[in-house]
Amino acid sequence: MIEEEVLKIIKPTEEDKKGIEKVLEIIRERLNKLDFEVEGSFRKGTWLRQDTDIDVFVFYPKDVGKEYLERNALNDIINRIKDLDYTLAYAEHPYVIVNINNVEVDIVPALRVESGDKAITAVDRTPFHTKYVTSHLDERGKDEVRLLKRFMKGIGVYGAELKVQGFSGYATELLIIYYGNFRKVLEEASKWKHPIKIELTKPMKIFSEPLIIPDPVDPKRNVTAAVSLKNIATFSIAAKYYLKNPSIEFFFPSKKVEEKVKGDVLILRLNLDEKSSEDIVWGQIKRSVNKIERALKQYGFRVIDVQAWGDTNNITIAVQLESKNIGQYYLNIGPQYYSETIEDFIQKNDNIWVGEDGRLYSIKERKEYDAETIAKKNIVLKVKYNIESYWLQNTEDQQIMKFLRKTPTWLK
């Protein structure tokens, strides 16, 4: 059976666990006498082999406030691990990523609160998530979560960060708790039609997102608020096709694809000079993608697709047009002859005539008709960056090939 094959690949071995424990021993020594806990998928037993990020939360009394976490707590943590390979990262507040033996450990300062619904920062709920999941999943349930995570990774809908807008690890755990197993999740997801409500607890507010899973530890929060409609639809379609024809391709899609260039494709390569929060950068990139598409359409280009990919330092924006060539002049459609606005139209336009339909027309010159210039002008990054741009002729870049192909390998 496909699932059993996949599980053999993704389920950690005893050796894997020992390797993680050795890393944790180093962290425990450094954080000695602090109030800390191991959280996340490792603690819950739902982690995937060779895909391990350990979450360690250092708790401080809630009375010290959020500002204390950003300054005092962070400095205290850095002083304890400063001789290790570490970097600063940013979410709601800064935290530290330590790399030990190729294992990333996120050390996150948080406030110790009485319950999940009393959270002051988003991470304060985490220990309550851990308790909820570990009390509702047995060993088989943990394996079912692993299968669901790998399936979502394979089809590209895993990860709640803004760059992906997909399902978080916690969301996958709740789906298994609610439906019972991997196959049952797929059976139900294949029938989804938004808005979808999955209630392990009664919500404490009205949610407007397409997929609603009220957080069992804080019912005022929707666990899947970040999941885009695109990713919900992708997951539903993938579930339907997997149930019809199970294949390992859903879990581990083919990396090498080939596709010819259709239309005209502009590639923009951005290299960021400054480090910034991933969510901040990708918020600006997503706004840039939308702005580029809107501007090109406004100037008369027929846009096939605009997408972006990369990390926080190197980003590619690909713009696919039916054609990059567009006329310098265009037909401007005016009002009907009886409209009160005809005088204004006549005053503002040249080359005016009355059409067979009784409507006024004119010829107008486009303010801009170079697609590359328009695209560059509509990048809204607030950090400094260098840009390289070119029109695609051919490529061996697999990300660009994926963009050109469109169809996921699991679909066809």
UniProtKB/Swiss-Prot annotation:
<dbReference type="InterPro" id="IPR006116">
    <property type="entry name" value="NT_2-5OAS_ClassI-CCAase"/>
</dbReference>
<keyword id="KW-0479">Metal-binding</keyword>
<feature type="binding site">
    <location>
        <position position="129"/>
    </location>
    <ligand>
        <name>CTP</name>
    </ligand>
</feature>
<keyword id="KW-0548">Nucleotidyltransferase</keyword>
<dbReference type="InterPro" id="IPR015329">
    <property type="entry name" value="tRNA_NucTransf2"/>
</dbReference>
<feature type="binding site">
    <location>
        <position position="158"/>
    </location>
    <ligand>
        <name>ATP</name>
    </ligand>
</feature>
<keyword id="KW-0547">Nucleotide-binding</keyword>
<dbReference type="Pfam" id="PF21133">
    <property type="entry name" value="CAA_C"/>
</dbReference>
<dbReference type="InterPro" id="IPR008229">
    <property type="entry name" value="CCA-adding_arc"/>
</dbReference>
<feature type="binding site">
    <location>
        <position position="149"/>
    </location>
    <ligand>
        <name>CTP</name>
    </ligand>
</feature>
<dbReference type="GO" id="GO:0001680">
    <property type="term" value="P:tRNA 3'-terminal CCA addition"/>
</dbReference>
<feature type="binding site">
    <location>
        <position position="106"/>
    </location>
    <ligand>
        <name>Mg(2+)</name>
    </ligand>
</feature>
<keyword id="KW-0819">tRNA processing</keyword>
<dbReference type="Pfam" id="PF01909">
    <property type="entry name" value="NTP_transf_2"/>
</dbReference>
<dbReference type="GO" id="GO:0005524">
    <property type="term" value="F:ATP binding"/>
</dbReference>
<dbReference type="Pfam" id="PF09249">
    <property type="entry name" value="tRNA_NucTransf2"/>
</dbReference>
<dbReference type="GO" id="GO:0000287">
    <property type="term" value="F:magnesium ion binding"/>
</dbReference>
<keyword id="KW-0808">Transferase</keyword>
<dbReference type="GO" id="GO:0004810">
    <property type="term" value="F:CCA tRNA nucleotidyltransferase activity"/>
</dbReference>
<comment type="similarity">
    <text>Belongs to the tRNA nucleotidyltransferase/poly(A) polymerase family. Archaeal CCA-adding enzyme subfamily.</text>
</comment>
<protein>
    <recommendedName>
        <fullName>CCA-adding enzyme</fullName>
        <ecNumber>2.7.7.72</ecNumber>
    </recommendedName>
</protein>
<feature type="binding site">
    <location>
        <position position="129"/>
    </location>
    <ligand>
        <name>ATP</name>
    </ligand>
</feature>
<dbReference type="InterPro" id="IPR042090">
    <property type="entry name" value="CCA_tRNA_nucleotrans_2"/>
</dbReference>
<keyword id="KW-0694">RNA-binding</keyword>
<feature type="binding site">
    <location>
        <position position="41"/>
    </location>
    <ligand>
        <name>ATP</name>
    </ligand>
</feature>
<feature type="binding site">
    <location>
        <position position="149"/>
    </location>
    <ligand>
        <name>ATP</name>
    </ligand>
</feature>
<dbReference type="GO" id="GO:0000049">
    <property type="term" value="F:tRNA binding"/>
</dbReference>
<keyword id="KW-0692">RNA repair</keyword>
<dbReference type="InterPro" id="IPR011068">
    <property type="entry name" value="NuclTrfase_I-like_C"/>
</dbReference>
<dbReference type="InterPro" id="IPR043519">
    <property type="entry name" value="NT_sf"/>
</dbReference>
<dbReference type="InterPro" id="IPR002934">
    <property type="entry name" value="Polymerase_NTP_transf_dom"/>
</dbReference>
<comment type="subunit">
    <text>Homodimer.</text>
</comment>
<feature type="binding site">
    <location>
        <position position="44"/>
    </location>
    <ligand>
        <name>CTP</name>
    </ligand>
</feature>
<feature type="binding site">
    <location>
        <position position="55"/>
    </location>
    <ligand>
        <name>Mg(2+)</name>
    </ligand>
</feature>
<feature type="binding site">
    <location>
        <position position="44"/>
    </location>
    <ligand>
        <name>ATP</name>
    </ligand>
</feature>
<dbReference type="InterPro" id="IPR048833">
    <property type="entry name" value="CAA_C"/>
</dbReference>
<keyword id="KW-0067">ATP-binding</keyword>
<keyword id="KW-0460">Magnesium</keyword>
<comment type="function">
    <text>Catalyzes the addition and repair of the essential 3'-terminal CCA sequence in tRNAs without using a nucleic acid template. Adds these three nucleotides in the order of C, C, and A to the tRNA nucleotide-73, using CTP and ATP as substrates and producing inorganic pyrophosphate. tRNA 3'-terminal CCA addition is required both for tRNA processing and repair. Also involved in tRNA surveillance by mediating tandem CCA addition to generate a CCACCA at the 3' terminus of unstable tRNAs. While stable tRNAs receive only 3'-terminal CCA, unstable tRNAs are marked with CCACCA and rapidly degraded.</text>
</comment>
<dbReference type="GO" id="GO:0042245">
    <property type="term" value="P:RNA repair"/>
</dbReference>
<feature type="binding site">
    <location>
        <position position="158"/>
    </location>
    <ligand>
        <name>CTP</name>
    </ligand>
</feature>
<feature type="binding site">
    <location>
        <position position="53"/>
    </location>
    <ligand>
        <name>Mg(2+)</name>
    </ligand>
</feature>
